Amino acid sequence: MLTKRFYNLAIMQDISNHTPMIQQYLKIKSQYQDILLFYRMGDFYELFFDDAKKAAELLDITLTARGKSNGESIPMAGVPYHAAEAYIAKIVKKGLSIAICEQTGDPNTSKGPVERQVTRIITPATVSEEAFLDNNQDSILVSIFEKNNKYYLAYTSYTQGKIYLVKTLTSLNELKNTVLKLSPQEIITNSRELAQQNPFKKPIKALEEWYYSNFEAKKYINDSLDTNIANNILNLYKNDQLTTIGSILSYLTNILKDTPRHITDISYEQEQDTLNIDINSRINLELDNNSKSSLLSIIGKCKTSLGSRLLKRYFSNPTRNLNILATRHSIINSLGENQHFLKIQDVLSYISDIERIISRVALGTVKPKDLVALRDSLEQLPILKKLLSEKNTPEITNINNRIHQLDELVTLLDKAIIENPPTTIRDGGVIKEGFDKELDELKSIKDNSYDFLIKFEELQKQKTGISTLKVGYNSVHGYYIELSKQHADKIPTEYVRRQTLKASERYITEELKNFEDKVLSSKEKALAREKLIYDTLLKKVIEYYKQIQETAASIAEIDVLANFAERAIKLKLSQPKFNNLAKLELKEVRHLAIEHNIDEPFIPNDTLLSKDTNTLQIITGPNMGGKSTYMRQVAQLIFLAYIGSFVPASYADICDIDTIYTRIGASDDISSGRSTFMVEMTETAYILNNASAKSLVIMDEIGRGTSTFDGLALAKACAEKFAQIGAFTLFATHYFELTELAKQYPNVCNIHFEAKEYKDNIYFMHKAVTGAAKKSYGIQVAKLAGISQDVLESAKQNLYNLEKKQQLTESTQVQAQFQLEPTTQNPLQQKLDAIDINTITPLEALNILFELKKTLI
């Protein structure tokens, strides 16, 4: 019995009331309730009921009707079979999944509806076709196994052929940050509650329990992976980790309807080797969003899709492994010599996405044009290897050795595939002449048919004496002899009528019929032969799978590093140094995005943070003075250093930083009912609870959104906490009272940004100077913003009155409530606080009361 979950409530559950075709549809749909079913009918994929309504809305196609259900029309929508790919791509990019249901039976022999089966399931993270993918971004499937308030997470970049296991996560916030950093196209989980809440705002589905069975997981690991890899995985990881890995393999098997043999590697991401940045900080620092001002858009100028995706992985997981960073820096320096990277980048620009092409070969979705692109790309490898060998360093040689020069495969593809093949093998015309003798002979029968028909037509004209006689062909009736009806008396007896038209008759002869059978038979045989050759060719190509994947990974690596070398020269970047002295010394630091987008010269600044001198900078100065830019550029520089890039500074000596936290800007989170201040406090609490002496913390204007005294009190308390933790902290504020902290804490210093006034105008110097700011210049900034003159004059008068009043009351009111020195507690209060009323005896209480009375007297 089918539920009403997947079709209109108006439809009766008893499908026997439907036509045989709709009955067939509903039976198939019952197995794919949560995804759209593309049901093949002739030259169209049709959708029915709620699927039709959803597709019509998503694709902007016409919603029609077919037949009745319970007295109401059945909604129907469809897309042409030959154009389906474009429509499917739209659906997948919106985060939905599709089941493709094809006609698998023979219409000529079928009794009732032609047999149909789902031949393929397409989900957002398991597509491999170029039309469905972003060339510059990995297509990622995440699996989350929740157990005992812990989250086990694994993910796969589907076309990369690898599964990555992440450390066990112990909080929802930690899980959310990890998932959003990966930016997956699809999430699967065993937790229905997590799927229902969906804190990630990504396509997510809760799977049946068996997907997360440890027994099933081990079975799929053994079935899917190479024996040695499987044994290693089973011995290396714990049961819950294996369950998570197995859930991905079982899900892929179900989607592919085959074992995912293209998965060849499982690896564990070591957190201690990673610079951690939560999702809010990534957004605040504009690291890798899609805007033109993002750091990625400025740094990322790779020549291949392979390199662009690898660079995004670097952005997702900056490494703290100094050996890896030293290797990258060494290669950047080598490629930068005499701008050798230019020659390499020129070759790289001719290399296609061979990683995804070979994955499509493995998955059975490859197209003939992909094979041509693979051949053309592999032809560039000898040139690339020669260029790399000219830089004979151990680091470059190591990469070069992993680029395989596949001459035999290039020769095979060159001989087999024509230069501009059709989109699919379906209609043939892919295999080059001369590659297969039998195919050539079958094709020659069709190719030589024109000569036969010319001779046959001339012979029939002579035989009948009818000069207007024509020999032709159409796809419905085949070959024919056409004569006008006025020549009916001259028709030879061996002519058999095939078709009657208004002014003519069409005939067939035994000789022409035999020729037709031979030609059509040869065409069918040629197509079958060509498909066999093509399948055999793909089996040969797949033998090179591991070599091509390794080559692709090496090309991606050299592309990223050549890009870094080019960016280093173009953007005047320098190689950073790393120290173990808990010191961060940066000279002439620049903000790349701002520098890129302004016409005037960018003013660089120095930054020094050290455990021995200062870990906390209190930064004051006017709005628009440069405080936020100063802080952001330091964080971006650290980030660039840990992805292996050179950095925008004349000098950079960097200590070990394990996490970057930022609290920059805020807005109301209306959907969650949280105010600006609540958002700010939540983010601040997260930083305070997690920051360590190895953290870099950026705090911009904390304490806004509440009263002045509340804001000042909170800002002071937070600053003191960061000073106590010893985290490297850049703390921008308009509360000038906080500058007094430098007198209390030896690791706190003041930095301010100056501005100059001239004839009622303000000029920002954008230069960081030691010491506290003396003025905020708020009214001058308001003038720059376009506030009218009458309002400005009123503001000046208000400011004068407030400052005058402040001078009179400052020593008694503000200092009494918010003095920076800790208030000395009243001795009487100290005695009262020391009493434990739960443990003292009545006699002791009387004695204490007597002593207190004496104190008061």
Swiss-Prot record:
Q: State where ATP binds.
A: 621-628
Give a yes or no for keyword GTP-binding in this entry: no
Q: Which GO MF terms does the UniProt record name? A: ATP binding; ATP-dependent DNA damage sensor activity; damaged DNA binding; mismatched DNA binding
* GO cellular component entries: cytosol
Matching Pfam families: MutS_I (PF01624), MutS_II (PF05188), MutS_III (PF05192), MutS_IV (PF05190), MutS_V (PF00488)
Instruction: State the Gene Ontology BP annotations.
Output: mismatch repair
Q: Which cysteines are joined by disulfide bonds?
A: none
Alphabetized SUPFAM superfamilies for the sequence: DNA repair protein MutS, domain I, DNA repair protein MutS, domain II, DNA repair protein MutS, domain III, P-loop containing nucleoside triphosphate hydrolases
Q: What is this protein called?
A: DNA mismatch repair protein MutS
Print the organism lineage: Bacteria, Pseudomonadati, Pseudomonadota, Gammaproteobacteria, Thiotrichales
